[in-house]
């Protein structure tokens, strides 16, 4: 009878230690995709800011006279 509680305790201790393969795969994909996504966001920001500045600067200059 002593073996059953010991077995249950060992099972509870071992289960969180085992990595979830799906979670590990998703985490590795996110780590790999992180820098690429950051570069894409930066490129989009540069393009958008360039477009806005090319539109807004002439408008502001026209308003100032």
From Swiss-Prot:
One of its GO terms (cellular component) is extracellular region. The modification Lysine amide is found at residue 64. One of its GO terms (molecular function) is toxin activity. This is Conotoxin VnMLCL-01. Residues 20-43 form a propeptide. Belongs to the conotoxin T superfamily. Residues 1-19 form the signal peptide. Expressed by the venom duct. It is found in: Secreted. The mature peptide does not contain cysteine residue. Keywords: Amidation, Cleavage on pair of basic residues, Neurotoxin, Secreted, Signal, Toxin. Transmembrane segments: none annotated.
């Amino acid at each position: 009878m002593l073996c059953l509680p010991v077995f249950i305790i060992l099972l509870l201790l071992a289960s969180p230690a085992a990595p979830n393969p799906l979670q590990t795969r998703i985490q590795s994909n996110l780590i790999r995709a992180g820098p690429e996504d950051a570069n894409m966001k930066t490129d989009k920001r540069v393009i958008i800011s360039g477009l806005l500045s090319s539109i807004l600067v002439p408008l502001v200059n026209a308003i100032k006279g």
